[in-house]
From Swiss-Prot:
Any one Gene Ontology BP term: amino acid biosynthetic process
Enzyme nomenclature, EC number: 1.1.1.25
Binding-site residues for NADP(+), renumbered to this chain: G125, S126, G127, G128, S129, L211, G234
Domain of life: Bacteria
SUPFAM superfamilies recorded: Aminoacid dehydrogenase-like, N-terminal domain, NAD(P)-binding Rossmann-fold domains
Residue positions binding shikimate: S14, E15, S16, T61, N86, D101, Y213
Catalysis performed (reactions): shikimate + NADP(+) = 3-dehydroshikimate + NADPH + H(+)
GO cellular component, one term: cytosol
Family: Belongs to the shikimate dehydrogenase family.
MF-aspect GO terms: NADP binding; shikimate 3-dehydrogenase (NADP+) activity
InterPro entries: Aminoacid_DH-like_N_sf, NAD(P)-bd_dom_sf, Shikimate_DH, Shikimate_DH-bd_N, Shikimate_DH_fam, Shikm_DH/Glu-tRNA_Rdtase
Protein name: Shikimate dehydrogenase (NADP(+))
Amino acid sequence: MYTTGLIGKNINYSESPEIHNNYYKKNNIPFFYKIFNLKQDQIDDFIKNLHKNNIKGFNVTIPYKETILQYLNDIVYPADKIGAVNTVAVQEDKLIGYNTDYIGFIKSLQYYNIQVKNFKCLIIGSGGSAKCIYYALKELNARDICIVSRNPEKARLKFEKKVKILNIKDENKLDRYDLIVNCTPIGGPNFKEQKPIELKEIKKNCVVYDLNYTPKRSKLLKEAKENGAFIINGEKMLIFQAYSAIGLWCLNGIKGGR
């Protein structure tokens, strides 16, 4: 039996163990999935003991999607371009990084039949998830992508020079956007009573996507719905990225073995 899991900070709310373990059981995969709540100074020991603990792969969430890069031997496209990894496969002598969030986001849009070609898009946040969503929207030929951040100067170091980056306090013309994506933890399980931005005026039929999936309808999504938006939470993205990660681990684990 191989161990897989999720590393992050304050992540006991995660639905990943249920999704993964149900899939393993249904498909007779000899894996088990668990939560690894880690402080940053515990990551070194976690990595050193991967083989000892029979860990074949793991997912990475807030706030370590960029931190994990320093531990990897190889980073597979598009994770190398994005600069963030959320899935790691453990081989005999290598750690291979992937970004299955990228795949999960694109598949979730396909699931809801949302075509973002020529869309004007607003990304809230500038961390690893935001970078992933930015490159996914570029791949899907979104016409214009703007990023808002609490720290735009720091955010500019993470993105292409041509990307429009604004202070979140200065962006109040939301009716120009066809798609708004929240890539911050604000509104999620650790910040349920907060919103990352006010949605006072949004375009009719705007799509508002909150990557948080707990609660199912965040304060941001509730306000968006009241203003006529089509709303999506991060649950389908979570499921699709999980299945993609499992495929990578099975390829390395069951077929490659140790």
